[in-house]
């Protein structure tokens, strides 16, 4: 089973919520207010903030006040005047554990809700934030779990209705807008009923009628947005908590039609502007999400259909509607017609990312918008080499922790601008409420070009940060993000280090890591406001964004003043020593000397701010140099570094060729870990300096590192050393770069068009899986003389196979095809030879698994491309998934959807699989179970109301078990079982 985990390592949050519609959408549903620290979202909007007594309060102060005094105080202070709001400590526990006090605050909100005016919010904004802080802490802390109980949250509903019944409940003066905004936030942290929901309609109508004016008003816009987001959030949480499958049976079903219809009105605004685009997007999103609670879901569904017609192709609104059709309506329009969503998405990728660049023999691929300058693409490549060189020096390892992961090939997706980046959520399915994001499970990070007005961080800075996350996942932290041991039980255990060190390594140069002016400028000038070591070392994403800057400062402190701590931390990570790491963190967070030195280092950084710059790659990388032979370069580097017997290899990129020189360096004496490191660091830098002083300018592109320290048989310390630099420019450097057109995708499976083989695949049981119309890049050499691949044929037909020797002729290798049922006798071989290609075809007489064996027939190394294609008409486009074990009981059944092809397998231990699916409307369904191997298999269908008696079964038809049945609304279980045969694969589809 293939698992994908998202490394959501975002460099920079996109600021204003209403400036980015997709960021609104993602945070609205994925990041409910109970899961994120909400007090960083806006500055206080309370009007009456005069306070003659104090400028700041803490829960310690509030605990000394009576309930009446607290309620009076909320009218005099801003919520930001409470220093530890949303923070769990003994004082906040004391405050919120007093149920009578919390109830008094809720009662106070009711009274204030009855009495606020158009110009005086009566402190409602501050009081709401105090209440939200309690519900937030109740979500995360069992000691306050009563605050997370829905029955207690419902106690806020009378106060909400009181606010809505006040004659001043409308958009207008600042006091009114503040109250409306606060109500929306409170709904998200508590609950709502249909009355609360429907009483928000006048606000939505008012905003709709004045949209040209109000869309320019941030407070009014956020107030309206909160109603959409938080009401949907509360309903979806109820749905999740009660395992709702019949959406007609909820407290809101059929009771909030007018609310949904009012939201949907915004989706029909065809005149999109920079001010109203966000609410149109959100209207599309929430209309689709809430449609299932409408008494006639086809009404909001048809609104989404209309969006596809009225908005321009490739526009943000168009793709928002496309995604809604896919996610909320099973890729069908309101009349039941299937829409080929995958085709539209692929067209969108080609539109927004028409350029493809390759580097390092295809190990780095950049997909970019047509407005991203090609010179910047090249500079990003060289920036990666600077970051990589310093990372490996400090981490001390350049061997991948796991072989065969997706990050064997790094893919970088760069959109033209922030506006186009919003489409990434639809085109690739990943969050866009950030400046960039690395997805470790697919070895890809996404970002966008930006102007100084759009971000204080340049594209190269962001790239350096995200590239560090790639290096962390590949060389430092075992396991995939959020899945490895360091994330178990506490997924924020190393967050401060991942983000802080990523900001640190973004300052890498050829010889060191320099302070970044953009980071130092974010450190508070007031020492009391800075993170101390204890606070930083326990920081998580839920704590906001500030820990990025202080994590950077701590990494810079370790690099310059405490290399031993830096080394100890990375050693625990490389060794997967979670307990050792936790012990080191606890010790360091309480070490007064570490904290003092860290704070002193921060003070020096702040004081020297004007002396810093932002490290970026030099223009030396972009200059043209005379060609120099590998032999000459090898000789010069060996002389500069005082080594012999190095190995130098060439790698090709789109614009230039580069080289890697590898050797070992043995220390004359062992002076301890840190002294050895300092010696090697100086030695490498001295070699780079010597090369710089030679006449050939290409040496100014050289980066180098040392890693993997170890003792040899003579008890001497040995390091691996690696030098990388420019070898020569190719013709693309002097002409417009040719854009690589994406191959036409005929098979809409969600697979990459170009993949690389994963060793070891030299036997049938280790074969790599491939797909039709996929290009496989692979290599055969003296140690790897054969490769095997397999594919599953779901129907009969003719298969074409082409294998091309990239750098030689077709006499150097051969291929054969085998059927899974007989691995001793091949069934096909090449029948046509054309220059460097071997081609052939064979007839698939019945569905099943087929293997391709590629083997060498000469002593030469062979780099080849393999492609298989279907010579018959392509099968209908369908989505494919794989079963997930254990699914052998009704309780553990895999949930599937209609029109999805499920691939499963059975063997002597696993003799049955069970799947569940939901039917919303009475319909006729076809069930087809296809035997991909020589198994005796069958299926039965059960309804949830009677799991003892099946209601349908299949009949044999060729190599499939098929059946047709008429099903009424409800939940059903498909029971697939084996009655003969050893082991094999099958596919099943319900449509």
Curated annotation (Swiss-Prot):
Q: Which cofactor does it need?
A: Ca(2+); Zn(2+)
Q: Where is this region: Catalytic subdomain?
A: 340-611
| Residues at the catalytic site | 466
**Which residues bind Ca(2+) 4 per the record?**
883, 885, 910, 913
Q: Where does Ca(2+) 3 bind?
A: 759, 761, 784, 787
Q: Which amino acid positions bind Ca(2+) 5, per UniProt?
A: 885, 887-888, 910, 913
Q: Where are the residues of the annotated region Activator domain?
A: 57-330
Question: What job does this protein perform?
Answer: Clostridial collagenases are among the most efficient degraders of eukaryotic collagen known; saprophytes use collagen as a carbon source while pathogens additionally digest collagen to aid in host colonization. Has both tripeptidylcarboxypeptidase on Gly-X-Y and endopeptidase activities; the endopeptidase cuts within the triple helix region of collagen while tripeptidylcarboxypeptidase successively digests the exposed ends, thus clostridial collagenases can digest large sections of collagen.
The UniProt similarity line reads: Belongs to the peptidase M9B family. Collagenase subfamily.
Instruction: Write down what this protein is called.
Output: Collagenase ColT
UniProt organism field: Clostridium tetani (strain Massachusetts / E88)
Task: State the taxonomy lineage.
Answer: Bacteria, Bacillati, Bacillota, Clostridia, Eubacteriales
Gene coding for it: colT
